[in-house]
From Swiss-Prot:
It catalyses: tRNA(Glu) + L-glutamate + ATP = L-glutamyl-tRNA(Glu) + AMP + diphosphate. Disulfide bonds: none annotated. Belongs to the class-I aminoacyl-tRNA synthetase family. Glutamate--tRNA ligase type 1 subfamily. Monomer. GO terms for molecular function: ATP binding; glutamate-tRNA ligase activity; tRNA binding; zinc ion binding. This is Glutamate--tRNA ligase. GO terms for cellular component: cytosol. The keyword RNA-binding does not apply. Zn(2+) binds at residues 110, 112, 137, 139. Its cofactor is Zn(2+). It comes from Endomicrobium trichonymphae. PANTHER family: GLUTAMATE--TRNA LIGASE, GLUTAMATE--TRNA LIGASE, MITOCHONDRIAL-RELATED. Its main location: cytoplasm.
Length: 494
């Protein structure tokens, strides 16, 4: 063995989902923490569902998350390659070891049809026995097998299981886990098509790729005894196993789209940061002694340990992920947020949304709205009013602030006075503008809010937004005065 070697082995039958990313992340962090190697292997033996497009989506998601692999597609080590199971199948890797097991009489060809096996299992259920294959082909003589082949019957290869006893897994996370061998049937290791079955292929690959630790979800724990028997039959040393807790949705239901996006790249489209998603997923099934919640990637590499993983299911909470994303955005400088936003626009194909926006004005607007951004997709709706020539006046804001019986006369007065005075305001800084507004309120014997609110609605069209005077400073004198005059003409010139 050559040090710690772990692998992430997704099946390209769809998008990379949250559970899969958590598995990849924990393997990656474990490798980083131990100075080991992280291997990416594509398990594409599902002949009907595996697609090249799904494989590309998986690679794209891994690249976005920057879970870089030491070995795998595009970065192959000739000692262990190829990293696609179908390519390995073409080289006869699995057939070689299946034939070895048959030669040792630890496996055998089975000619039973799916319909025959279905009948066996139904009968076992009716007899209140475990619904498993009954071993019909286990004791066929060489002559009987030859006759089956003459008849053109296709055979799978089944592994011979023990009918009694217990298999014990020493799991890093779960401790000793016992399996009753009597519940395990003679399982298929090679399909009739010559494609290896999952349990067989991953054992052969893990051994040949010198995988030292298998970290995976606990939905795979039922596969462990079968895989352990294959290791023993071939005389191979087993890796260490660690089965991580499942991720569930709210209320303990199986995670689905109603709990949030299942595809990782959907989170990218929504404007989540990779650091936020990684930070959040690290908390699903793992924790530190001090219950720290916010981590940098480097901190996760330093602090992660499999021993701190729990066995209770983790609940996926979209609200916490959203909160964490906002925290990560607030930890960035405005320049970094700008760069992330531009990258997001390119990824989502929305470059035209901002192609007429002044870059320096956008950067200044982002400074003002920095603390309100939870998702990158929030940015356009937060800052778009800075760039419009025609203010989009929100109906509620206009009714309440400009046109209500209680406010309209004062609002008209404030806007007309401001349109006349602001062009002569030499210092258009936020501090001076606030002083101007307070002086106007005192002069007219009205409340400061009666000055602030009409100006805000006149120049932005809305009641909420960044600090009024900081916003005015960023817009600049000419645009502020223009907007105020537009509002006067629109709402008060009859």
């Amino acid at each position: 063995m050559s040090g710690i070697r772990v692998r992430f082995a997704p099946s390209p039958t769809g998008d990379l989902h949250i559970g899969g990313v958590r598995t990849a992340l924990f393997n990656w962090l474990f490798a980083k923490n131990k100075g080991g190697k992280f291997i990416l292997r594509i398990e594409d033996t599902d002949e009907t569902r595996s697609t090249g497009e799904s494989a590309k989506v998986i690679l794209d998601a891994m690249k976005w998350l920057e879970l870089e692999w030491n070995e795998g597609p595009g970065n192959e080590n000739l000692k262990y390659s190829p990293y696609s199971q179908m390519k390995r199948k073409e080289r006869g890797i699995y057939r070689k070891y299946a034939d070895e097991l048959v030669a040792k009489e630890l496996a055998y060809p089975c000619y039973c049809t799916p319909e025959e096996i279905d009948v066996m299992r139904k009968k076992a259920k009716a007899d209140k026995l475990p619904p498993k294959y009954d071993g019909k082909c286990r004791h066929l003589t060489p002559g009987q097998r030859k006759q089956k082949e003459i008849e053109g019957k296709k055979a799978v290869v089944r592994f011979k299981m023990f009918g009694s006893g217990t298999t014990v897994l020493n799991d890093i996370i779960r401790g000793r886990v016992k399996f009753d061998n009597s519940l395990l049937d003679d399982f298929v290791i090679m399909k009739a098509s010559g494609v290896p079955a999952y349990n067989f292929a991953c054992v052969v690959d893990d051994y040949l790729m010198e995988i030292t630790h298998v970290l995976r979800g606990d939905d795979h724990i039922s596969n462990a005894p079968r895989q352990m028997h294959i290791y023993n039959a071939l005389g191979w040393e087993m890796p260490e196993f660690a089965h991580m807790s499942m991720i569930l949705g709210a209320g303990g239901a199986r995670l689905s789209k109603r709990h949030g996006h299942t595809s990782v790249l959907e989170y990218r489209k929504e404007g989540y940061l990779r650091e936020a998603l990684i930070n959040y997923l690290a908390l699903l099934g793992w924790s530190t002694e001090d219950s720290q919640q916010i981590f940098t990637i480097e901190e996760l590499k330093q602090k992660f340990s499999v021993e701190r993983c729990g066995i209770s299911p983790s609940i996926f909470d979209p609200a916490k992920l959203l909160w964490l994303n906002g925290e990560k955005i607030r930890s960035k400088t405005p320049q970094q947020v700008y760069e992330l936003f531009i990258d997001w626009l390119k990824y989502t194909g929305n470059e035209k949304l901002t192609e007429t926006w002044d870059v320096e004005l956008l950067k200044k607007a982002l400074i003002l709205e920095h603390d309100k951004i939870k998702l990158l997709k929030d940015i356009p709706s937060l800052v778009d009013f800075f760039f419009t020539k025609n203010v989009d006046y929100k109906e509620e804001a206009v009714k309440k602030t400009l046109l209500s019986e209680k406010s309209k006369d004062i609002a008209k007065l404030v806007l007309i006075e401001s349109a006349a005075r602001l062009p002569n305001q030499l210092d258009f800084s936020a501090i001076s503008l606030e002083q101007y507004a307070r002086n106007l309120a005192a002069e007219k014997n009205i409340k400061t809010g009666q000055v602030f609110h009409p100006i805000r609605v006149a120049i932005s069209g809305r009641m909420q937004g960044p600090g009024l005077f900081q916003m005015m400073e960023v817009m600049g004198k000419e645009d502020v005065v223009r907007r105020i005059n537009v509002a006067i003409n629109k709402f008060f010139q009859k």
